[in-house]
């Protein structure tokens, strides 16, 4: 009921990745929740675990998107958020076969919408050195 007022729901499936032997499966409760959310809302599922977790999904019929982010790390989460909101393009391919719904090399390519991304100043034509000088001047002015 709490999600009813929302048009879009982004569900991040996070599992610890400190060891490759850690359990990566969805619980039965999580599968029921996903099914119910997808039935009533626009759902994007972002999996921060091994791709084999997708084998637990009985259906993705009502899912509007599935993103395979692989690692549960700060960098993966930041890049994934940029992808979802259009700052980065999607171009990866699923490296393993996960049955008929997700055969090997499954992919959906998207184009970046030209929004601001996380990155270095040089990636958008700016200079780190000059920005540090500006930062120093502003800091001095504030004190």
Name what the model sees in each region.
Residues 1-125, 129:
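C-terminal non-catalytic regions of proteins with extracellular/luminal or membrane-system context
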């Amino acid at each position: 009921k709490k999600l009813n007022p929302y048009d879009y729901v982004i569900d991040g499936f996070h599992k610890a990745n400190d060891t490759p032997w850690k359990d990566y499966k969805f619980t039965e409760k999580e599968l029921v929740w996903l099914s119910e959310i997808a039935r009533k809302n626009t759902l994007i599922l972002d999996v921060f675990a091994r791709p084999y977790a997708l084998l637990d999904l009985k259906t993705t019929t009502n899912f509007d998107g599935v993103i395979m982010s692989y690692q549960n790390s700060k960098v993966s989460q930041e890049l994934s958020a940029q992808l979802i909101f259009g700052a980065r393009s999607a171009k990866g391919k699923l490296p393993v076969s996960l049955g008929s719904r997700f055969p090997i090399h499954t992919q959906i390519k998207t184009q970046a919408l030209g929004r601001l991304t996380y990155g270095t100043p040089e990636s958008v034509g700016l200079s780190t050195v000059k920005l540090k000088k500006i930062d120093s001047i502003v800091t001095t002015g504030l004190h």
